[in-house]
Regions:
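Catalytic-core regions built around general acid/base machinery
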Residues: 43, 47, 94-106
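Structural motif
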Residues: 89, 112-114
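Short, well-ordered beta-strand core segments
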Residues: 109, 116, 130-131, 191
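Glycine- (often His-adjacent) and acidic-residue-rich active-site loop
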Residues: 28, 36, 56, 63-97
Length: 254
């Protein structure tokens, strides 16, 4: 872990007995989503690759900071390129790395959703075990509600989690799903008080970490096989649609 522990601006790492914790943040506070070269969008894909390559990791816990998982955009992190057209190739590459590298982590992942996950909640629900604080809620506010095509993987993830029709409704309307409803729908395993969330994640992590390393790795492989196949088939296409809609103004808006 020493080669990446202090490498990232938006992610803190700690590890005990093979259980790695990745804590997302923005300047030490709750994580916000931005598009700068030092944003979570830029860093997470690289971080997931570093984590995947570290054989000392037996379990990975992904969580946020304070009372929010990721609930808002970061206005202090604008993209550095002179225009959206100049930025989009980087954003597309980062988008591909973000979910593909998360799913390429070869050990089980636990998502500990410490508060609202309103932007890129798929990062949490793609984990093998999803725990949520009572105050957590899930939505996709970064795309259709904000005028963007939901093509960066959420178009694959949410219809898989919720079923085709409910998933499309969720993406089109910006529906917010609370923690208890998320558990009822099946994409959250346990709902806990915020103070009990990380201790429970660590308890589960320690329990799993006692299993043989190869058992964990091959179990993870079979559990995410279909997700990886779907991402391979659909992510590039979806990002292409998202970028096209951003770069080509609608009639009357040119």
């Amino acid at each position: 872990m020493s080669d990446y522990a202090d490498k990232y601006h938006c992610i803190n790492f700690s590890r005990a007995d093979g259980v790695l914790e990745m804590t997302m943040h923005s300047r030490g506070g709750p994580a916000k989503w931005g598009t700068s070269l030092q944003s979570l969008h830029a860093e997470l894909g690289h971080a997931f690759l570093d984590v995947a390559r570290d054989y000392e990791n037996k379990i990975v816990i992904l969580t946020g900071t304070g009372d929010s998982f990721i609930s808002e955009m970061d206005a202090e992190e604008p993209f550095p390129e002179p225009s959206l057209a100049h930025m989009w190739p980087r954003i597309q590459d980062e988008g591909l790395a973000l979910l593909n590298n998360l799913l390429a982590i070869p050990v089980p992942m636990i998502g500990a959703v410490n508060g609202p996950a309103l932007i890129h909640a798929e990062l949490a629900v793609l984990c093998d075990i999803v725990l949520a604080a009572e105050q957590a809620e899930f939505a996709d506010l970064a795309h259709v509600p904000g005028g963007a095509v939901p093509g960066d993987g959420v178009h694959t993830v949410w219809p898989m989690m919720l079923g085709p029709n409910r998933g499309r409704y969720f993406l089109l309307t910006g529906e917010r799903i609370g923690a208890d409803e998320a558990k009822r729908l099946g994409f959250v395993a346990e709902v806990l008080g915020r103070d009990a969330l990380l201790p429970r994640a660590r308890e589960l992590g320690a329990q799993l970490a006692r299993l043989p390393a190869l058992t964990l790795r091959h179990t993870r492989s079979v559990l995410v096989r279909e997700l990886r196949r779907r991402m391979f088939d659909e992510l590039s296409n979806g990002l292409g649609h998202e970028g096209l809609a951003m770069l080509c103004p609608s009639p009357g808006q040119a």
